[in-house]
Amino acid sequence: MITIGITGGIGSGKSVVSRILLTLGIPVYDSDSRAKWLNDHSPVVRQALTGLIGSDLYENGILRRDRLAAAIFSSGDLLEQVNGIIHPEVKKDFCQWRSECESDLCAIESAILFSSGFNSLCDTVIRVDAPEKIRQERAMARDGSSAETMRQRMLSQEREQSLAKAGADHTVLNAPPHLLVPQVVRIIETVRTKRPNPPDRL
């Protein structure tokens, strides 16, 4: 099975590309939503996070994300430790999901594909891009955030975006006059064409 990574900055249109792949019959793993699910339901994650931060991090069995964010904000090195807990569990969850896929291709969508190391699970990576102004406008309309809040979020992603720009195999442009669907379809055709032939059976 060939694994495709999908990444891009906020407002770039990663989820749109994921939906295109789904319409092409390619299953897509949403690492963000699965990470949130694991934060709430994985005993491994819960035990490690409460051991690191405190038992009041969970309320009625659900992670209080505001408390986690406050703890990370108050401690410079805590984010790396939290990621060290969550990312390995997401990788395990993805590998289990992939093993159950009945398809020649599958994909994983992640805004932090490279900094998390998820790119090591991929055979090829698609980076979704758009001009910064368009990305900001899209994200503000979607999230209802202020321009300053969105600017800070985009600044926080600069390192990841540099890694993605250097490491991605394909880039699609999700802004006029570029049409997104034909770009994605061409990449999938290329990936399928270049896949290695199975060995001859004796």
Curated annotation (Swiss-Prot):
Segments for region (Disordered): 138-161
GO MF, one example: dephospho-CoA kinase activity
Reactions catalysed according to its record: 3'-dephospho-CoA + ATP = ADP + CoA + H(+)
Compartments, as annotated in UniProt: Cytoplasm
Pathway note: Cofactor biosynthesis; coenzyme A biosynthesis; CoA from (R)-pantothenate: step 5/5
Alphabetized UniProt keyword annotations: ATP-binding, Coenzyme A biosynthesis, Cytoplasm, Kinase, Nucleotide-binding, Transferase
Nucleotide-binding listed as a keyword: yes
Domain called DPCK: residue spans: 3-202
Residues holding ATP: 11-16
Family designation: Belongs to the CoaE family.
PANTHER family on file: BIFUNCTIONAL COENZYME A SYNTHASE-RELATED (PTHR10695:SF46), DEPHOSPHO-COA KINASE-RELATED (PTHR10695)
The protein's name: Dephospho-CoA kinase
Organismal lineage: Bacteria, Pseudomonadati, Bacteroidota, Bacteroidia, Bacteroidales
